[in-house]
């Protein structure tokens, strides 16, 4: 295990080199990316937010916003690293495009989600037939979404008559996964469902006062099993 007071990097942690690609093409270097926020978690759809400095008060226009680069629905990829040794942090689609005007300046804010977001947009009803495994039903549902890859671990529960009734595909999938003691992950347009790993070697060790920047921890007795 490396020193817990530092986090190993492939290059010296000096110059950060972020890259944003839309439909596979890097955005112009003239666009000033002010902030990147990546949010990934279990049983949640991966999200990203870009804040770009945009707006010319003298010309009274927003060049980046007025263009067609960040039109909702376009594929986007965010990469970052040190000294151009970059790796992918997020892949997904643009879902929201907004501008903000403040006394301190103006911004273009782009919100993105993993392609699994399409699973949350409508409710469906479906009969899957007799004696079908939950993993097979989930694979069938996920296979109806273009651009989304499914990696579903085998599940032991078999239903005699499995029905999805007036539920979004995302709620149906997370519900069946929970019933089988599994977690749902969305990462780079891949839907992964597997059991949590509770053994093995730690990937990284974080230390309070050194590598831990923010932490929220709590215990809530209301949800503890007696």
Model-predicted segments: where are they?
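Assembly/oligomerization scaffold segments
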Residues: 1-117
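Short beta-strand-centered interaction patches in the first periplasmic/extracellular domains
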Residues: 2-6, 96-98, 107-110, 114-116, ...
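Short secondary-structure junction motifs
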Residues: 45, 89, 147, 181, ...
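N-terminal export/assembly leaders
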Residues: 47, 120-122, 138-163
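Polar, S/T/G-rich
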Residues: 81, 85, 131-144, 165-178, ...
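PEST-like low-complexity, intrinsically disordered acidic/proline/serine-rich tracts
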Residues: 124-126
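C-terminal amphipathic alpha-helical segment
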Residues: 214-226
């Amino acid at each position: 295990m490396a020193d817990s007071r530092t986090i190993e990097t492939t290059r010296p942690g000096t110059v950060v080199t972020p890259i944003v690609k839309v439909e596979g093409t890097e955005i112009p270097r003239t666009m000033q990316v002010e902030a990147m926020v990546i949010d990934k978690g279990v049983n949640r759809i991966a999200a990203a937010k870009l804040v770009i400095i945009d707006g010319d008060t003298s010309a009274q226009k927003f060049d980046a916003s007025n263009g067609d680069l960040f039109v909702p629905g376009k594929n986007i990829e965010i990469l970052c690293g040190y000294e151009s040794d970059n790796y992918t942090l997020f892949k997904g689609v643009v879902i929201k495009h907004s501008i903000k005007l403040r006394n301190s300046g103006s911004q273009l804010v782009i919100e993105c989600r993993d392609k699994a977001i399409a699973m949350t947009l409508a409710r469906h009803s479906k009969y899957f037939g007799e004696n079908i495994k939950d993993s097979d039903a989930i694979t069938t549902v996920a296979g109806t979404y273009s651009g989304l890859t499914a990696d579903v671990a085998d599940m032991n529960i078999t239903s005699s008559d499995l029905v999805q009734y007036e539920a979004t595909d995302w709620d149906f999938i997370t519900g069946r996964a929970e019933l089988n003691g599994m977690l749902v992950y969305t990462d780079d347009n891949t839907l992964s469902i597997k059991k949590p790993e509770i053994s093995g070697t730690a990937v990284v060790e974080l230390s309070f006062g050194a590598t831990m920047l923010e932490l929220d921890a709590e215990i809530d007795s209301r949800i503890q099993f007696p």
